A protein has these predicted regions:
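N-terminally biased helix-coil "hinge/interface" segments that flank
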Residues: 1-77
């Protein structure tokens, strides 16, 4: 599985995709407020929610889930 997270100026978006051969299927997606005072808070809130877990870090460390991330914010962060 792959999770894509985009940190925007207002919203942090996360989407979970399943790999089926060369096809990707959207499994889940969430939208959470961007926490401009500490970006990691909103980032991990989105990540945990899209994976439906309390702490996504073990899944990332084990390689069970791949992570792709970006920022579409225009200034301000």
């Amino acid at each position: 599985q792959t999770v894509s997270v985009d940190i925007g100026s207002t919203w942090t978006k996360a989407a979970l995709f399943a790999h089926e051969g060369e096809e990707l299927t959207l499994v889940n997606h969430v939208l959470t407020p961007t926490t401009t005072h500490h970006l990691a808070d909103g980032f991990f809130a989105s990540l945990n929610q899209v994976l439906n877990v309390a702490d996504a870090r073990p899944l990332l460390k084990s390689g069970e889930v791949q992570l792709k991330y970006s920022s579409s914010a225009k200034g301000g962060l």
